[in-house]
Amino acid sequence: MLRLARIITGRLRSIGLALGTALLLAGCSTLQLGYNQAHTLLYWWIDGYADLGDMQSARLRQDIDGLLAWHRQQELPAYAQRLRQWRTLAAQDLTAEQVCREADALRTATSRLMERGHEPLTRLALTLTPAQRDHLQRHQTKSNEGFEKDFLRGSASARLERRLERTLDRYETLYGRLTDAQVALVRQSLQASPFDPARTLAQRRERQAEMLALIGQLQAGQPRPLAASEPVPRAAGQAVLGWLQRGLFPSPTGSDAPAWVRHGCEGFAQLHNSTSPQQRRHAQDVLQGYEDDLRALTTQH
């Protein structure tokens, strides 16, 4: 994924936004290859959660095609322009307010994707069988176990080292190798972070339970099977969209932004302002490569 966005948002994304994030920030050192495989990756990601049947698979693939076509045409040019702006920002010192504004732009783009993609997810929710809902719940449990392993198991120092390793990987992809002083700065920021993994895990479980309950409610309110070509009921679609949007990370620029959101912006700005001219040029080169890839993708069909 675009490493800068991962650093800025940090823990701002919830598991419920994985689909949107994959599309919104799709990218790596081979961004074009990754984006061109997005159809397959998204399909298998959803299938892993729901164990789809043949008819569900056919309709989902069709919906993904439409979503990606819209995304390529309507969203990628805006992302490329945003990367150009980030290249300019990378050459100068940043304030936490600037970083929060950029994170808020990512949040807005995610919201647009949800508005476009909620109908296919609603259609799928209406067709899930009891066995598929059980499969979904087991997958959620497995996902939570992975979160526990990463963020809650082991001593406090071991947990910190795991977080530090992941964070440094993201920073060094953008800036190149960090100095010892910069590594110490990142460590200090993580130690002071208000991020509470136990609370986050509890919130994840609440969201997952809410999703399962919503699926049950939607199916109970659907008197007959939905035809493949039939639009989803508006009320059902709005209910799913509401669930998705409640999972968005809080607006970093809002007056009620949680402390951990503000801390993430401050931590990024602090590290960036410690970088050397060479490190900033490295960041600009990385962002230029992403921008070039996105502009090339907009011309592909």
Model feature map: region roles:
Residues 100-184, 190-191:
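Acidic/His-rich structured neighborhood in mature extracellular/periplasmic domains
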Residues 91-107, 167-170, 233-255:
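Short, flexible domain-boundary/linker segments around small modular repeats
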Residues 43-44, 201-301:
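A cross-kingdom marker for long, charged
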Residues 31-135, 139, 286-290:
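N-terminal Sec/ER secretory leader and immediately downstream segment
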Residues 2-16:
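Bacterial N-terminal signal peptides that target proteins for export
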Residues 26-27:
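C-terminal motif of bacterial Sec signal peptides marking the signal peptidase cleavage site
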Residues 175-204, 208-212:
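Helix-loop elements that line ligand-binding/catalytic pockets
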Residues 46, 60, 117-128, 136, ...:
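Short, structured motif recognition centered on aromatic/hydrophobic residues
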